[in-house]
Amino acid sequence: MITRRTLALLAVTFLAPAAAEAGAAKPKLEARIGELKAKTAALVAAQRPHLDALSPPQRLAAPPAIWRVPGGLTDFKDCSRCPQMVVIPAGEFTMGSPPSDKQAETQHRVTIAAPFAVSKFEITFDQWDDCVKNRGCGGYRPEDEGWGRGKRPVVNLSWENARDYVSWLSVKTGKPYRLLSEAEWEYAARAGTTTPFWFGATIVPSQANFDGSTDGSGPSELNRQKTMPVGSFPANAFGLHDMHGNAWEWVEDCWHDDYTAKAPTDGSAWVEDGCRGHVGRGGSWEDSQSELRSSARSGGFKDELSSTDGLRIARGL
């Protein structure tokens, strides 16, 4: 992933952004819950005589967990080898960093109007290799840098590779998998917090995989200099692991130097035709803690490969 020091070079290569039309307003979560409750009550009333007639062993199984989205957070998988997904609730948050941080991350309010699902872990080599085995992902087998494959996050992925994976998974499952938007990613990473990290104001190498030796946040021996198996570090309040560090995670958005009045406030991706660069979030094993902040952003060309770049995925509900 290209770091902030080279983003100015990226910016001058991009086509001038087209004015984005505001998306259609999404229904409020409260209205959606009310509608689901009403429909459920009607269905139960209609089927009550039949249900009462069944003996206990014959009673219908509980509905799939994903049907219970309004009731709370839920994990699910669409197939045995599919990524484990976590339902993220709707809500509002302040995206970006305060002026005191002196970063190109201007704060603004964003509304996530409907729940969506995010992979609990970064996509692993096992999951990527399953895509290749099933004639997907362009047959591309990325290098693992000698660190091993298995449950380590897949790296050496371009943004285009990341799009290939979600396209394949969507066809395989018939479900709407995609990359997260920048806003969705930060909302999921923060998990209700307003501090630089979901842990608080600082982060140490026992909490995430990054280069703690570069800024004094940890002893040099804890600079692991490679990825770690996913789930090696604690999950945030939404149940997501490795939102800070391990591998940069490609999102859908085109790269923009900073948020402006054109930046979406509804959680959608900020895209335009012809953009060559895209955004990465989360930082990686080789970055200092400043690059791991929930608001930190980086960018890269859509066909760029790096041992720091991987992905996390989203799914519509």
Where are these regions (language model features)?
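A short glycine-rich, aromatic-capped structural motif
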Residues: 77-138, 158-160, 245, 317
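Short capping motifs at secondary-structure boundaries
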Residues: 49, 54, 129-141, 169-175
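N-terminal export leaders
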Residues: 7-8
